[in-house]
From Swiss-Prot:
Localization per Swiss-Prot or TrEMBL: Cytoplasm; Chromosome, Centromere, Kinetochore; Cytoplasm, Cytoskeleton, Spindle pole
Skewed-composition ranges (Low complexity): 96-107
Protein name: Cytoplasmic dynein 1 intermediate chain 1
Taxonomic source organism: Rattus norvegicus (Rat)
Similarity section: Belongs to the dynein intermediate chain family.
Region annotated Interaction with DYNLT1, chain positions: 145-161
Oligomeric and partner information: Homodimer. The cytoplasmic dynein 1 complex consists of two catalytic heavy chains (HCs) and a number of non-catalytic subunits presented by intermediate chains (ICs), light intermediate chains (LICs) and light chains (LCs); the composition seems to vary in respect to the IC, LIC and LC composition. The heavy chain homodimer serves as a scaffold for the probable homodimeric assembly of the respective non-catalytic subunits. The ICs and LICs bind directly to the HC dimer and the LCs assemble on the IC dimer. Isoform 1, isoform 2 and isoform 3 interact with DYNC1H1.
Record lineage: Eukaryota, Metazoa, Chordata, Craniata, Vertebrata
Domain of life, per lineage: Eukaryota
Annotated region described as Interaction with DCTN1, given as residue ranges: 2-123
Modified residues (Phosphothreonine): 105, 174
Modified residues (Phosphoserine): 50, 100, 107, 111, 177, 195, 633
Role noted for this protein: Acts as one of several non-catalytic accessory components of the cytoplasmic dynein 1 complex that are thought to be involved in linking dynein to cargos and to adapter proteins that regulate dynein function. Cytoplasmic dynein 1 acts as a motor for the intracellular retrograde motility of vesicles and organelles along microtubules. The intermediate chains mediate the binding of dynein to dynactin via its 150 kDa component (p150-glued) DCTN1. May play a role in mediating the interaction of cytoplasmic dynein with membranous organelles and kinetochores.
Chief location bin: cytoplasm
Tissue-specificity statement: High levels seen in the brain and testis, while a lower level expression is seen in the liver, spleen, kidney, lung, skeletal muscle and heart.
Amino acid sequence: MSDKSDLKAELERKKQRLAQIREEKKRKEEERKKKEADMQQKKEPVPDDSDLDRKRRETEALLQSIGISPEPPLVQPLHFLTWDTCYFHYLVPTPMSPSSKSVSTPSEAGSQDDLGPLTRTLQWDTDPSVLQLQSDSELGRRLNKLGVSKVTQVDFLPREVVSYSKETQTPLATHQSEEDEEDEEMVEPKVGHDSELENQDKKQETKEAPPRELTEEEKQQILHSEEFLIFFDRTIRVIERALAEDSDIFFDYSGRELEEKDGDVQAGANLSFNRQFYDEHWSKHRVVTCMDWSLQYPELMVASYSNNEDAPHEPDGVALVWNMKFKKTTPEYVFHCQSSVMSVCFARFHPNLVVGGTYSGQIVLWDNRSHRRTPVQRTPLSAAAHTHPVYCVNVVGTQNAHNLITVSTDGKMCSWSLDMLSTPQESMELVYNKSKPVAVTGMAFPTGDVNNFVVGSEEGTVYTACRHGSKAGIGEVFEGHQGPVTGINCHMAVGPIDFSHLFVTSSFDWTVKLWTTKHNKPLYSFEDNADYVYDVMWSPVHPALFACVDGMGRLDLWNLNSDTEVPTASVAIEGAYALNRVRWAQGGKEVAVGDSEGRIWIYDVGELAVPHNDEWTRFARTLVEIRANRADSEEEGAVELAA
């Protein structure tokens, strides 16, 4: 510790000494500059000489301009001429003949002995004011009359010549004391630091001028410009992702390929809660009416909501796009319209479009490439389109030939082109027995079929229907439910055995029923629920697995290969709010449910959703057993009826 303290004290003393040296050096420099300024002020220019030089230069320039080379000057400067007490700087001769070339003084005679016969001597006349020049080279002696000029002594500092080359440069000689030399040696290590400080000062001086302050009018113009709104809408989503997690927040949903997830989300056969989607502003006091997952971006899900009675000034219909990939708590996109959205789906083959069916009967189309939250297209409220609530919207077909199919509760089915929603391409009245319109509450197309479909009605009856052909309209009738059909879904898993003829329905009669289009009676009735069953859906990857939700907030998963009496897995949400909708994710590993409070619950299914190689054959045997049991029960019923 003592060594460190001594070292610090020594450093402090050196710093103080350096500061004193700098101050002393600065003071001496200021005194030297002051003396030089005083000497410059005492100096006076020679008006005669300067005027003469100026005239000589003008004459030489004039002669050179007309092509005549000027002769050497007839007057040569003399350094000093001492004769008793006389001092001469210049000898100004009277006009002489052009043969005279130069003059010299006795003081310079010694240095000019080697100049040959052209040297001249200076002699005094009887008149002290006249000087005679005599040339040894001339044959005759000729006298030149000279005049005496006023002499003023001036000392000029020599001009400093700086040449930029690799040779060593030496400044003008300056007298320095030994103390100054020691000071410079002590300060020398700090030269680099001082140069850095000087560079920093220069950089600060050369900084750009501060930007001009915008006026309020210019600020408002920028805030309301379309470019700013598009930039702000895009940037705020990126910032929300960055605040939520450290994933690839710059992923763009406008056309880049999806990065597939690796590995299973959850191992095990039980349902585990993953996350919840809820927005305090847009979800509060609204009921989840429909949900759909995107085919192009499997992590995106859209949900539609009914009106909020506590906020009459808010839009009645809302559709929110949620993102499973990022942990942010706000929706990816917010869409709304002036009527409650009863059904919603992503437009297949158009990853940027979202289709919604409203309570007023309008079909609305949103585009996430537009910065507007309102629909970019909508159908008219006219007799040619829907005038009743639309609970069914679906895009069917192929990439090059597809249509939007919508059905309203008055039994009217319309086919639309997504490029033009002003008028439907075709429409059909779903009427039973040519007089009774079908109040459709649900619609489903079998996998790979765009012509035949099944619908559920408010009366509890299920119908098959056809879009084209001689049997267009309502076909078969399936009776079995004792209440309105709330959900209907066709078998979706594709495998070695085709089960596309199967479909399931849910109803207010607390049951879920399994059907086949080959028979108008239910194959099986699942009666484990104690409240309204609001929705049902097959797993997209497992042939024997489906999910259903009821009014008690319970989510049930049924694996028919394991058991047909009780659910394989079941979970009740917190608060026991009624669950209105259920939707499987495209990979079949997650299932989403929406409740009556506007919340969406995401559950991981785990290995329960992963099918084994023998699942299709096992499910075929299960169906055979179900048919056999149904046949036995029908025979027993017939015997009892006969008895």
